[in-house]
Regions:
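C-terminal tail/sorting-segment detector
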Residues: 393-409
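Acidic, Ser/Thr/Pro-rich low-complexity intrinsically disordered segments
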Residues: 863-865
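Family-specific functional microsites
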Residues: 856
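Glycoside hydrolase catalytic-domain context in secreted enzymes
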Residues: 1-392, 408-853, 867-946
Length: 946
C-alpha cells in the first residue's frame, strides 16, 4: 500500500491536472492565449451547454456527481466576463432545440444541432466582447464509428458558417475542440482562427482543466498522440476501412507517422507529437550508449532548456531510423519519450532516457534475413533523433552494426491464411522519401491445433471433495492441481461462465461476476470476483456515483506516465471502495484510422505510447490489489461489424504494432486480466484463437493471468461459423471466462462445454487449466480477502466513505396501495442515466413486489446493453438486463427484499441506458404482515423501559 488517501477533492485535482496536460495547443497567433484578466468573452457553439465528458457505450456510462463543463468553468472564474446577452440567446433557442441523446445504445448523434450564427448576431456581440471562444463538440463510441461526413469527422455547414462569421468579425478567436479523437482540420487554414486547441473529452473535471490552460494557470504541454493528415483519404487504412466482412491491413506496419514519414510527409498537416506552448524550449540530445544485441538498449541524454518567458513543461520524443535492409523499415519509430518538470525561464533539465532494442527491432515473417519468425536488427547504420515532434526531431547520434543480430527467437503464430499484398518501401528520392511498392504476405504453414495437441496440460483426474479450500493453496498446504481435482466436470464448466450483467452476487450494477458464481464453488472457498466497465470510470448501472476520468486520447497526449499513474492510484482506491476487482480497461487498441468510434477510449496510433500508458495505469491500480482488464485483444480497429469483420493482417504487423502495446502492458505493467475482442483475426475469432491466447500471450510473453471474452462474444472452430455457445473452443485456446451468462449453474446460455468435454473435443485438463488461471487471479483480489476475513483498515475506511455517498436521484411521484396499484407509465423517465422515484404509501405493512413487461426498443442494436435497476429504499432489489435483440415482451417480477415496517417506502427505477420499453407496471402486496408487525411493535413497547 502507498500513502495515497482516498479523497474526491484530491482525485478531482489530479484529474484536472491530467486534463490540462493532455490539452494540445495547435495554433496561437499573436499570443492570443493565455487570456488576460478582465477578458470579455463571447462564447459560441451549443456544445457549451452539452459538454462531452466521454464517448458513448460501455466506456462512457459513468454516473457522476457533477460535470464541470467549459462554460461552467469560465462562468465560475471572476477573472473573465462572459457575454450574457449571447448566452441568453442560446438558452432561448435551446428551448425549442433540446439536447438529442438518441434513441438508445449506439444511436446517439455524433453532434448536436448548431444554432445559426449570423454575421449580424456576431457584430452585436462584438459591441460587448473583445474575444470569441468557439466550442465544437463530437462524440462516437461502442457500436458507432465516426464517418467521413459532416457532423462527424467533418464540420457541418452551420459550424462553418459560425467560424466564417465569428473569425471575420473578431480579431481574436479561439476554437476549442471537445472531441474524443482527431477530426478533419482543413478549416483551420480557411477560417484562420487565432488559436485552436484539442481539449478532448475530459471527464467530470474537463472544463476545469480547459480553464487552467486558457487562463495560463497551466502552460500547455500536450502533444498529439496521432498524425493529422490533410484528408481522411491520406491515411492508407481508409481504403480498406469499414467493410462488413473483411478489414484488410494492407498498409502493414506503416500506420500513422510510420507511413507518413516514410512515404508521404507532404500530406501531414500536424505531425505526431506536435503541440505548442506559451513558452519556448531548446532541446539538445546525445546518444550516451548503444548496445544493439539481444537484451541490449540505447541510452540517450536530452537537455531541455526553457528559453521563453513563461514557466512550463516540455515533452520530448526519441525516434530511431533503422536501415532498410531486406525487410524494409519505417523512416521513424518512437523508441522513448519523457516529460520535464515545470521549468522556470532559463532553467534546464536533463532527461536520461533508455530504449530497449525491442522498441525498434523488426520481425521477419518472410525468412528473407535467414532468421524467419525472429525479431532482428539488420546490419547497417541506426540513427537516433530527438525533439518535440516526429517531423522536427533532430539527429542526436548514430551507431552501426556489421552483421545481423537476432534479438528474439519466436515461432510462426496468427499467420494469415488468405493471400493478400502489403505495402513496403521501394526507392527513396533525394529527400529520403520512399515510393510505395507491394509484396505478397507470407501465409500460415503450421496448424494451431497441431501446437495445441503437442502442448496439452497434464490430466488432473477427479478426486471428489477432499475438504480442501482455496485458502489451502495460498497457505501452501496443497497445490492448485490438488485443489481443483476436487471439482467435478460440471463444476469446472460452471467456473468458466461469468454471470451478468448486474449480477446480484457482486457489487450492484456492475458488468459481471466470475469465479465463485455457484454455491458449490463458494463452498470450496472460491470468491465471486467483480468486474465493472471502464475505462472512463466505474460504470454501475444501479446509479451509484463514480468518478468520470479524462478519455484515453487526452491522457496519452500528456506524455506523462507519472501523472497518469498518480491519477490511477485514486482509481484503484475507488475500485476497492466499490468492491470491484477489475476495471474493464484500459482500452489499448491502436488508432489505425481516425474513424474508429472507440478511439476516444484508446490512446494512440503508436504502440510504445499505448503500452506505457497502460502499464502506468495498471501498476498504480495494483497497489491496492485491484487491476484493469486490458482490451480488446486484438485488432479492434472498427466498430462496424465488429463481430464479423475478419482482420486480414500479417504476422509482422501484429508483432510490431497491434500486439506490441499489449506486450508492454503484460511485461512492464504486470497485467493480470485481458479481454479478447469480438471479431476474427485471420479467420479465427479471437475468443477461441489458440495462437493469440496461448502461443503468443502465455508461452512467449509468460502471461499467467485470466482472459475473458467481451460480453456475449463468439468463438469458432476454424472454417466453421462462430457461436456464443462455443465455450469449448474458448477454453481450448485459454480464454478462461465466457462473459456473460444469466445463470452459470443452469447453463442458461446453453453452451457446449459439457457436450464437447464428453466427446473428447476438449479435455478436462484444459478446463482445470482455465480454472487455475481464474483462481490465481482471485487469490490476489480483495474479493478473496473479504471471503477469508482479512479486510484491512483501508477497507473499513473506504466502506465508511461509501456509506456517506449518495446515488443519483430523479423525479418523484406519490402512489397509494392496498393490495395492488398501477404505476402511470408516463411517470417513468426511461432515458439514459435518469431515475424515477415512487413514494409508496401502503394501507398495510408487509412484503411487496413490482411486476411489469419489458422489451428492447425496435431500433436497439442487437448487442446493446440495456439495464433497469429497481431499488427498495436504498437497497437494490434487482437489475433487469436486456440485450438489444430482446424484442419480445417479457414479464418481469421484482420482489422487494425487506418487509415493510412503516407505511411508506420508496421505489426507485434507474435506467443505465435508454432503449427499454415498459408496460403494465404494477406494485403488489405479496404478503400482509400487519398483524404480525403490530404484535412485534406491541411487545417491543412493553419491553422497552421508560
Amino acid at each position: 500500500m502507498t500513502d495515497v488517501i482516498y479523497s474526491v477533492e484530491n482525485y478531482a485535482k489530479t484529474a484536472r491536472k491530467a486534463v490540462a496536460e493532455g490539452i494540445v495547443l495547435m495554433k496561437n497567433d499573436g499570443e492570443v492565449l493565455p487570456l488576460k484578466a478582465g477578458a470579455k468573452i463571447a462564447l459560441f457553439g451549443r456544445s457549451q451547454f452539452c459538454y462531452y465528458k466521454s464517448g458513448t457505450g460501455s466506456g462512457g456510462m459513468v454516473n457522476t456527481a457533477y460535470v464541470n463543463g467549459i462554460r461552467e468553468a469560465l462562468e465560475g472564474d471572476d477573472r473573465f466576463v462572459l457575454n450574457r446577452t449571447l448566452s441568453d440567446t442560446y438558452e432561448e433557442w435551446l428551448k425549442d432545440h433540446p439536447f438529442d441523446q438518441g434513441a438508445g445504445w449506439a444511436q446517439e448523434p455524433w453532434f448536436q444541432e448548431e444554432m445559426p450564427i449570423s454575421r449580424e448576431l456576431v457584430e452585436e456581440t462584438r459591441k460587448e466582447s473583445d474575444i470569441a471562444v468557439i466550442i465544437i463538440g463530437r462524440t462516437a463510441g461502442e457500436d458507432k464509428d465516426n464517418a467521413a461526413e459532416e457532423g462527424s469527422y467533418l464540420l457541418t455547414a452551420a459550424e462553418k458558417e459560425m467560424l466564417q462569421n465569428v473569425c471575420s468579425v473578431y480579431e481574436r478567436t479561439i476554437v476549442l475542440l471537445n472531441v474524443g479523437n482527431i477530426i478533419d482540420m482543413k478549416w483551420v487554414d480557411k477560417y484562420d482562427p487565432s488559436a485552436v486547441l484539442y481539449v478532448w473529452q475530459g471527464g467530470q473535471e474537463g472544463g476545469s482543466g480547459v480553464l487552467d490552460v486558457l487562463s495560463g494557470d497551466e502552460c500547455p504541454s500536450g502533444r498529439l498522440s496521432d498524425t493529422i493528415a490533410y484528408d481522411i483519404k491520406d491515411y492508407p487504412s481508409t481504403a480498406y476501412y469499414g467493410d462488413t466482412l473483411e478489414n484488410k491491413y494492407a498498409e502493414d506496419i506503416y500506420v500513422g507517422y510510420r507511413y507518413f514519414s516514410t512515404f508521404a510527409p507532404e500530406k501531414v498537416q500536424y505531425p505526431f507529437g506536435f503541440g505548442l506552448s506559451y513558452t519556448q524550449f531548446e532541446v539538445n540530445g546525445e546518444v550516451k550508449a548503444a548496445s544493439l544485441t539481444a537484451g541490449g538498449k540505447v541510452t540517450v541524454e536530452i537537455s531541455v532548456k526553457n528559453i521563453g518567458r513563461v514557466a512550463g513543461k516540455n515533452a520530448v520524443q526519441v525516434y530511431c531510423q533503422a536501415p532498410q535492409g531486406e525487410l524494409g523499415k519505417p523512416a521513424r519509430v518512437l523508441i522513448a519519450y519523457g516529460k520535464t518538470e515545470v521549468l522556470m525561464p532559463g532553467e534546464t533539465q536533463v532527461l536520461q532516457l533508455e530504449a530497449p532494442v525491442s522498441a525498434f527491432a523488426s520481425f521477419d515473417d518472410t525468412g528473407r534475413t535467414g532468421q524467419k519468425s525472429c525479431f532482428v536488427l539488420e546490419a547497417g547504420e541506426y540513427r537516433f533523433y530527438a525533439g518535440e515532434n516526429v517531423r522536427d526531431a533532430g539527429l542526436i547520434g548514430s551507431t552501426s552494426i556489421d552483421t545481423l543480430a537476432v534479438t528474439e527467437q519466436l515461432s510462426e503464430a496468427i499467420a494469415p491464411v488468405k493471400a493478400f499484398r502489403r505495402m513496403k518501401p521501394a526507392c527513396a528520392d533525394e529527400k529520403g522519401v520512399y515510393s510505395v511498392d507491394w509484396e505478397d504476405v507470407p501465409l500460415r504453414t503450421i496448424d494451431p491445433m497441431e501446437k495445441r495437441a503437442s502442448n496439452l496440460p497434464k490430466e488432473v483426474p477427479y478426486t471428489g471433495d477432499q475438504g480442501y479450500k482455496l485458502s489451502f493453496v495460498e497457505e501452501g498446504r496443497v497445490t492448485m492441481e490438488q485443489f481443483l481435482a476436487q471439482l467435478s466436470d460440471e463444476e469446472l464448466c460452471c467456473m468458466i461462465r461469468g454471470e451478468g450483467m448486474c449480477s446480484p452476487k457482486v457489487t450492484a450494477g456492475t458488468a459481471g461476476a466470475f469465479g465463485g458464481v455457484t454455491e458449490r464453488l463458494q463452498y470450496f472457498g472460491i470468491p465471486a470476483g467483480c468486474c465493472a466497465d471502464g475505462p472512463s470510470g466505474i460504470r454501475m448501472d444501479c446509479g451509484t456515483i463514480a468518478f468520470a476520468m479524462p478519455n484515453g486520447t487526452c491522457l496519452a497526449c500528456s506524455f506523462n506516465d507519472a501523472l497518469i499513474g498518480e491519477l490511477y492510484e485514486y482509481e484503484g482506491l475507488e475500485l476497492r471502495k466499490n468492491k470491484v476487482d477489475t476495471l474493464l480497461g484500459p482500452g489499448i487498441n491502436l488508432h489505425r484510422n481516425p474513424l474508429n468510434g472507440r478511439n476516444f477510449e484508446y490512446f494512440s496510433e503508436d504502440p510504445l505510447l499505448t503500452g506505457r500508458m497502460a502499464a502506468a495505469q495498471l501498476l498504480s491500480m495494483q497497489k491496492y490489489d485491484v487491476t484493469g482488464t486490458i482490451k480488446h485483444f486484438a485488432c479492434n480497429s472498427q466498430e462496424h461489424s465488429r463481430n464479423f469483420a475478419n482482420a486480414v493482417v500479417s504476422q509482422r504487423a501484429l508483432r510490431e504494432l497491434y500486439l506490441k502495446g499489449f506486450e508492454i502492458a503484460v511485461r512492464e505493467g504486470q497485467a493480470r486480466s485481458i479481454m479478447s475482442s469480438y471479431g476474427p483475426i485471420n479467420g479465427i475469432w479471437t475468443a477461441g484463437n489458440y495462437d493469440l491466447l496461448t502461443t503468443v500471450l502465455r508461452n512467449e510473453w509468460g502471461y499467467a493471468g485470466i482472459v475473458m471474452t467481451d460480453w456475449w462474444a463468439k468463438a469458432n472452430d476454424e472454417g466453421q461459423p462462430a457461436s456464443f455457445q462455443n465455450t469449448a473452443a474458448m477454453v481450448r485456446a485459454q480464454n478462461d471466462l465466457y462473459m456473460v451468462t444469466g445463470d452459470s449453474l443452469s447453463n442458461s446460455n446453453e453452451d457446449n462445454s459439457m457436450e464437447k468435454l464428453a466427446d473428447g473435443s476438449v479435455f478436462r485438463s484444459e478446463y482445470v487449466r482455465s480454472a487455475a488461471n481464474i483462481c490465481r487471479f482471485l487469490l490476489q483480489s480483495p474479493a478473496y480477502l473479504r471471503m477469508v476475513g482479512k479486510e484491512t483498515d483501508l477497507d473499513r475506511e473506504l466502506q465508511r466513505l461509501a456509506e456517506q455517498e449518495m446515488s443519483v436521484t430523479g423525479n418523484m411521484f406519490k402512489l397509494e396501495i392496498f393490495e395492488e396499484a398501477d404505476v402511470d407509465e408516463t411517470w417513468i423517465d426511461k432515458a439514459k442515466g435518469k431515475s424515477t422515484t415512487l413514494e409508496v404509501t401502503a394501507k398495510e405493512r408487509g412484503l411487496f413486489r413490482m411486476e411489469f413487461e419489458c422489451r428492447a426498443a425496435a431500433d436497439a442494436a442487437p448487442l446493446a446493453q440495456i439495464n433497469l435497476s429497481v431499488f427498495q429504499d436504498k437497497q437494490l432489489a434487482e437489475t433487469v438486463t436486456l440485450a438489444g435483440s430482446d424484442k419480445e415482451w417479457t414479464k418481469k417480477v421484482v420482489h422487494f427484499p425487506d418487509p415493510l415496517f412503516s407505511y411508506t417506502f420508496f421505489v426507485k427505477l434507474f435506467f443505465g441506458m435508454s432503449g427499454m420499453e415498459l408496460r403494465n407496471i404494477k406494485i403488489y402486496m405479496t404478503k400482509s404482515m400487519e398483524e404480525e408487525t403490530r404484535l412485534k411493535m406491541k411487545i417491543h413497547r412493553e419491553e422497552t423501559p421508560e
